Design a protein with these regions (language model features):
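Outer-membrane beta-barrel channel domains
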Residues: 1-30, 34-40, 45, 49-55, ...
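N-terminal glycine-/serine-/threonine-rich phosphate-binding loop
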Residues: 59-64
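Exposed, low-structure sequence patches enriched in small/polar residues
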Residues: 176, 274-609
Length: 609
């Protein structure tokens, strides 16, 4: 028995047509698909091997590297699948967006490596772990025990002697993998998944007393196990699952276990999801936390969500997972109204959400109210409005462990207009205003232009400019500085399909910052307002920053599921003392001193059933 769903994007109308006709706001999906029964089918065992060979030339380190490996896939039945990779190479994967983050909270980057993306659904233990969100409201960072971007990520930090040094570039280079294997399947009402990955040892270049040396660090081993029981008696969906992860390293092991439960009423109007988890970091600290979320479909197009979460200060899932912060108790809520066929407009989505939060010491560490409204006019133009409000609170993170301080009441507002994206030429433009942590102002302007003359070619230009007065950044110990800063963020993206089998893609993203020191502050010894002080002794805190990614990527499908990749990558992450630098000076400084300047050729060919 199968459930059938067909969908087609109608470009000139900017609509998606489907059968059965299911709206994006529907609370049920799989259970309402068109049922089809197919008889006399004998599923065939499937297997495939994808051997590859790659050569890369690193023009920064003047090294040429050869790499040979294979991906493999075996499906002995429709209920079991085994996949793996040996000596993988991910050099041809599309680059991440460029982000300069000087705060204490980590930026989440979605997974783009195909091996880790495929078959990942069983390891998604709650809606909070699903990064494929939609809608006008800002869902925030995910809460997930399995963030595969940790695998083959940056090396672990090293303890160095006073005369030893390692550049930031070396600590940002990815770690190679020896291999990985993944098993997913189902038996009756049980779904399961097993996953393991193994990093190679890594040599990190550095200096000791000015002499070049190599520091060797062993790689980490990763393991994930997932089991979930699902039942849909009387039309209501119930599920209970366990998810366990392990990261093993000579410096210490990190073990995390979570239990999750899910419930959906037969009419799809009430959905409950919950997860509790515990972490054990090398037997030295054990933490606990969890959350419960409720979603209520009040009527067609109207949804109310409520969530409660608690994480103690010892919970740490970030060796393999992603959690923006621990030491937190938070209540959050959202109310979403989606309307269509308004007569004077095609559709509208209204989103009102907010949260209140305190840490385990009882300090009020944050709250916010966000209002978003996306209006699509009958000519397919779109107007987007966002308004935010943040009351006074304590910041216990951005001192990087040096104390807790007060932040001011803040407001922000932004509006954006986008022309119909069904035309050959389309554009968008917006303006925003918000207040800084201590009350300064932040003004931004952004927009873009897209040219799509036919189905084979597209060109996109995006820009963002910001002027900040009062940007608060931690410096060292208990010292903080506010800056007058300007930020310039242009990006270019070009796609050209020579044919259905050949594609050329070029992307350029750059972030440039000019920040001049303004006022100087000291974090109090007990939670309270920052204390304004004279400039501490030492060099100027003013700085410039250039971060860039340029990628030129050619792909030729020489046979089904077999590809030739030719890729050029150039990246920069350059900090410099701010003098009379222009943005062109800052861009040139990063371009001429790249962290990556690599040419890659990779051939991958499929053999199998």
């Amino acid at each position: 028995k199968l459930g059938l769903f067909m969908s087609r994007q109608v470009g000139y109308l900017d609509e998606r047509w489907s059968w059965p006709g299911l709206l994006s706001s529907e609370s049920k999906f799989l259970s309402v698909l068109q049922p089809i029964e197919v008889r006399g089918v004998s599923p065939k065992k499937q297997y495939a091997f994808f051997p590859f060979s790659a050569i890369s030339r690193n023009r920064v380190d003047h090294e040429t590297r050869y790499r040979v490996g294979t991906d493999f896939f075996w499906r002995p039945s429709s209920n079991l699948q085994l996949s793996g990779t040996v000596n993988p190479d991910f050099g041809s994967v599309e680059s991440d967006d460029v982000v300069i983050n000087l705060s204490a909270t980590e930026t989440f980057f979605p997974e783009k490596r195909l091996f880790f993306v495929e078959g990942q659904e069983v390891f998604v233990a709650s809606p909070r772990a699903d990064t494929r969100g939609s809608g006008v409201g800002n869902r925030g960072a995910p809460y997930t025990m399995v963030n595969t971007r940790r695998i083959g990520g940056k090396p672990r930090s090293l303890s160095l002697a006073a005369d030893e040094n390692i550049t930031d570039r070396e600590l940002d280079l990815p770690v190679d993998l020896m291999g990985a294997v993944k098993v997913t399947g189902q038996t009756g009402r049980l779904r399961y998944g097993l996953f393991s990955a193994f990093e190679e040892d890594v040599d990190i270049r550095g200096t000791k007393a000015g002499t070049p040396v190599k520091f060797t660090q062993t790689g980490s081993d990763y393991g994930v196990a997932r089991l979930i029981y699902e039942d849909s008696k009387a039309g209501a969906y119930r599920a209970f699952g366990i998810l366990s992860t392990a990261v093993l390293h000579e410096s210490g092991d990190a073990l995390v276990t979570g239990l999750d439960g899910h419930y959906l009423t037969s009419d799809g109007k009430i959905q409950l999801d919950a997860q509790v988890m515990t972490s054990d970091i090398d037997g030295q600290s054990r933490g606990y936390g969890g959350f419960i979320d409720g979603e209520f479909a009040i009527k067609k197009g109207v949804v109310q969500r409520v969530g409660i979460e608690y994480f103690d200060r010892d919970l740490d899932i970030n060796d393999l997972g992603f959690l923006e912060r621990n030491d937190s108790f938070r209540i959050r809520s959202s109310h979403i109204r989606t309307s269509s066929g308004l007569g004077w407009a095609k559709s509208n989505q209204f989103d009102l959400r907010g949260y209140v939060q305190e840490n385990n010491d009882g300090l009020f560490t944050g709250a916010a109210v966000f209002l978003s409204d996306s209006l699509t006019l009958n000519n397919l133009s779109n107007v987007l409005l966002r308004v935010g409000f943040f009351p006074k609170a304590f910041d216990d993170l951005n001192s990087f462990g040096n104390g807790t301080y007060r932040t001011a009441l803040r407001r922000d507002v932004a509006i954006r207009f986008s022309s119909p994206n069904t035309n050959k030429w389309s554009f968008g433009s917006g303006i925003g205003w918000r207040e800084e942590m201590l009350g300064g102002r932040h003004i931004s302007v952004g927009g873009g232009l897209t040219w799509r003359p036919n189905d084979r070619f597209s060109f996109r230009l995006r820009y963002f400019w910001a002027d900040r007065d009062g940007w608060l950044i931690h410096q060292e110990a208990r010292n903080m500085t506010t800056f007058k800063a300007q930020q310039w963020v242009p990006s270019l993206n070009m796609d050209y399909f020579f044919s259905a089998k050949q594609q050329l893609k070029a992307t350029l993203q750059w972030v440039g910052i000019k920040a001049a020191e303004d006022e100087f502050w000291e974090i109090p010894s007990s939670p309270g307002a920052l204390v304004k002080v004279a400039k501490p002794a030492g060099p100027s805190d003013s700085f410039g920053k250039s971060q860039m990614t340029f990628q030129l990527r050619y792909r030729w499908e020489i046979a089904p599921l077999s590809d030739l990749f030719i890729v050029y990558i150039r990246g920069a992450d350059k900090g410099l003392g701010l003098q009379d630098n222009s943005f062109s000076d800052i861009f040139q400084a990063g371009w001429e001193d790249p962290t990556a300047d690599t040419f890659i050729v990779k051939l991958r060919y499929r053999f199998g059933s």
